[in-house]
Amino acid sequence: DPMFSAENFMAFSKEVFIKLQAAWTDRKWEEIRPFESNELFEQHSKQLQQYIDTKRINIVDRVSVRKTYLNSFTQDGDKETLKMTLKAVMKDYIINEETKEVLEGNPNQDMYMVYTLTFIRKAGVKTVEGTDKKSTTNCPNCGAPTNITSSGKCEYCGSVITTGEYDWVLSNLEGHPGM
C-alpha cells in the first residue's frame, strides 16, 4: 500500500480513541459509528445502554494520548489487521445521572492506561490520500452526502460502510492499567 503512512494512521487512531471517549461520556454513541465495526459498535452500544438504564454516567475526560506505536500487520484471507498500542492518561469515574454523586472512581485522580487497538479492512484496499481526515459526509461507494445509520449503511445506496470494506475500522479495544 504505497500511500499508507504509519504516522498518519497513528494520528487517525488517536483521533478515533479520543472521539470514542467523548461519545461514551456524552452518551452519543452514534457519533462513533463510522469508526467501529458492526460487532464492536453493538457491544459498546449495549454497554452504554446499561449505564443509561441504571441512570449512571461513565465520565471519561481530560484524555491525553501519550504514545502510540504499531504492533503488527497481518493479512488473513480477505481481511487485513493492524494492531497498535496506545498509552493514555485520563480521568475515569462514574456518577449518578440525577444527583451527580460519584459512585465509582475518583474525578481528581489520573488513570494511566495502556490499550491495544485492532483495526481491520478488506484485503487489497489501498489508502487514499487524506483518509487520516476521515469524513462521514460522503459515502465512499456512491459519493452521496450521507449520515451513517445505526446499521452502518449509507441511506442512499445501502452500502454497509463500517465493515472495513473501504477503510480501516476499529474492531477491538482492550485496556489495562499501566504506563
What does each model-identified segment do?
Residues 23-25, 45-52, 71-80, 145-150:
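Short, charged low-complexity intrinsically disordered segments located at boundaries
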Residues 37, 89, 124:
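Residue-level marker of positions within ordered structural domains that often coincide
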Residues 1, 26, 53, 61, ...:
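Acidic-enriched, low-complexity/disordered segments with a strong bias for Aspartate over Glutamate
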Residues 1-62, 141, 155-160, 176:
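Core segments of small alpha/beta cavity-forming domains
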Residues 1, 13-14, 65, 94, ...:
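Generic alpha-helix detector with strongest preference for long hydrophobic helices that associate
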Residues 17, 53-58, 67-71, 102-104, ...:
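Sparse, context-dependent recognition of short Cys/His-centered cofactor- or disulfide-binding micro-motifs
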Residues 53-98:
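Surface-exposed, charged secondary-structure patches
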Residues 81, 99-179:
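Short beta-strand edge/turn micro-motifs at domain boundaries
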